[in-house]
Amino acid sequence: CFNNRENGLTKVLGVNASPNTIDELLSAEVILCAGFVAKENQVIRLKLKQAAANGAKVILVNPEGYEQDHMSFAYKTISTSNSLAFFKGVAKVLVDMGKGAGVEGYDAFKASVENADVCEEIKAVAELYANAKKAMIVFQQNVVSVEAATLLADIAVLSGHIGKARDGILELKAKNNSQGIIDLGITAGAEAMEGVKALLVFGEDVPADALKELVFLMVCDTHMTETAKMADVVIPGTGFASTYGTYTNTERRLQVVEQAIEEDVVFNNWEVAAELAHVYEIEMPYDDIEDISDEMNEKLPVYRYGEMGEVSGGVLECKDAKLVAVEDAALIAPLKCTDHLTNMIDERLPKAN
């Protein structure tokens, strides 16, 4: 998936998912937001606004020139350089407070932030966050860099604000079913294209440079995208409104999708893959979506015991958490969305003032 990015949380917490859930924000005392773009996350912005109304101190940290709009309810908005300097300073303050001394990797991490600069503002934020009874960190996975996500997880582990209700991290995934893709074991991003000579693309408008080494390209999509124009074969696909099944959203909640539109296509998207497998004498014994769901339930415990509308796994305890030192890097490194329908809808939606 071209919209996949390595998850910095995995290095520290051992999980490739958001440990906490959205409504936990409403009962937190302090919420630290890093690289948060309000206009791209209106639902979360409203939750943050509700949390502030409930008494939470919402702190927004974005690089200079980056969006600070639509967050007037925030307790503090901070403009910093597009680097990890601010959060390395926060980590140093936590270390100096004696936090996290018993955690695996502590000595190497302590050495990595020993020379971090600490100003009064950094010290105040670190102490406010560390001393809260319940504190959350919020960030967008495909907006902050991998190193930034790793450092934010380090900060949560150092402070002890991890693995408990209303005490942890809310990692916002790029799309409505990004977590579902990860649960199926699909974690590779554009780096998986190295050496690939033939490609089947579902719904993504891929940068042309990523396709130049291909000898065969097949596209299944709802529109004649730029990628489809380059393809050797194009098959009409079905959009989200013409499918049914489930999504697993950013907080690991299972959500039912009901078909709203009947599209005049020969194959549904999953049937395209099944028919291609049949050509290569690989049988996929599915008659319908229910058969696929049954196999997922059999092979994936997280879905076997999942209930529709519920969060799979509850709050993740992250018992194997450790500290991981990070090199200097950007705080913000947005990954461009290649989902054609998502981009088309985003272009046509009215923009907030």
What label would you give each PLM region?
Residues 2-307, 353:
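Non-catalytic alpha/beta scaffold blocks inside enzyme catalytic domains
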Residues 148-153, 292-353:
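Long, low-complexity segments enriched in small/aliphatic residues
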